[in-house]
Amino acid sequence: MVAETPEITVRDNVEAQVYDALIGDQVVGSIVYERSGQRLVFSHTIVEPEFRSRGIGTVLVTKALDDIRARGMTLTNYCEFVADFIAAHPGYADLIDAEHPGHPRRRRAKGVEGAEGA
């Protein structure tokens, strides 16, 4: 039997400078960022432990990157989870700011789950 994943809503909480993933009214994940002109700077992604391994991080990153593209903005990335996502989905690589890319993709140590947990 396959468990259904509840519908995930992603919103940009501009005042708090986070993209939030919600199931109903509950925030289950976030991408923390700062805005610098027409560029967002991602610092880290968090998914609450009890909601990990359900694809929430993937939905959150996808919708946040789609929003950046729709706004005509660029991204400086310091989050390894987002770096791994972009490496696996190179169609988003053009969003990385050429002058301020952040850090290059780094692999996590084998067997070590990052704090992000997707």
What is the predicted role of each segment?
Residues 53-66:
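Conserved acetyl-CoA-binding loop-helix of GNAT-fold acetyltransferases
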Residues 45-52:
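A short, internal acetyl-CoA/4′-phosphopantetheine-binding micro-motif in the GNAT/acyltransferase core
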